[in-house]
Amino acid sequence: MRALYPGSFDPLTLGHLDLIERGCSLFGEVVVAVLQNPGKSPAFSLDQRLEQITQATSHLQGVTVTSFNGLTVNCAREHHAQLILRGLRAMSDFEYELQIAHTNRSLDSEFETIFLSTAAHYSFLSSSVVKEVARFGGRVEHMVPAVVAEDLKRFFNSAL
């Protein structure tokens, strides 16, 4: 079975990576789909995020890294995914993700959304929190894969 895991991943966190690993274990294949969102100003370019995820998942079998714009269900169909994988950190995530899942279902009833709760030790993580910590010189090695930690240091050092 193939799961689509969509997101902006700006940057990829260890919480994201944990979900990818667990998704591979449960479903066999995970397509990590990086959203090209023209409405956002990401810290990392699309190519950088694709490379970060590719490097961080190189130890896993069954991971494909791609990008998309537009509707998640169209990306899922294009990559022959049977389900959409999403992570939940808190109840606030659930309310938002449930709304998106219902929207996706209304667009194409073929796709189910599977929610996995985040591992407790990653429940505080978000890409926004990671960038904020890195911006002020805090350690992020326990929050992101090594390749991302190095890229964050370079990004914020060059911004000074």
Swiss-Prot record:
The record marks H16 as: Transition state stabilizer. It is an enzyme of class 2 (transferase). It catalyses: (R)-4'-phosphopantetheine + ATP + H(+) = 3'-dephospho-CoA + diphosphate. GO terms for molecular function: ATP binding; pantetheine-phosphate adenylyltransferase activity. GO terms for cellular component: cytoplasm. It is found in: Cytoplasm. Its EC number is 2.7.7.3. Pathway: Cofactor biosynthesis; coenzyme A biosynthesis; CoA from (R)-pantothenate: step 4/5. SUPFAM superfamilies: Nucleotidylyl transferase. Its cofactor is Mg(2+). Keywords: ATP-binding, Coenzyme A biosynthesis, Cytoplasm, Magnesium, Nucleotide-binding, Nucleotidyltransferase, Transferase. Substrate binds at S8, K40, T72, R86. The keyword Hydrolase does not apply. GO terms for biological process: coenzyme A biosynthetic process. Gene3D superfamilies: HUPs. The keyword Nucleotidyltransferase applies. ATP binds at S8, F9, H16, G87, L88, R89, E97, Y122, S123, F124, L125, S126, S127, S128. Homohexamer. Reversibly transfers an adenylyl group from ATP to 4'-phosphopantetheine, yielding dephospho-CoA (dPCoA) and pyrophosphate. NCBIfam families: coaD_prev_kdtB, cyt_tran_rel. Belongs to the bacterial CoaD family. HAMAP family: PPAT_bact. This is Phosphopantetheine adenylyltransferase.
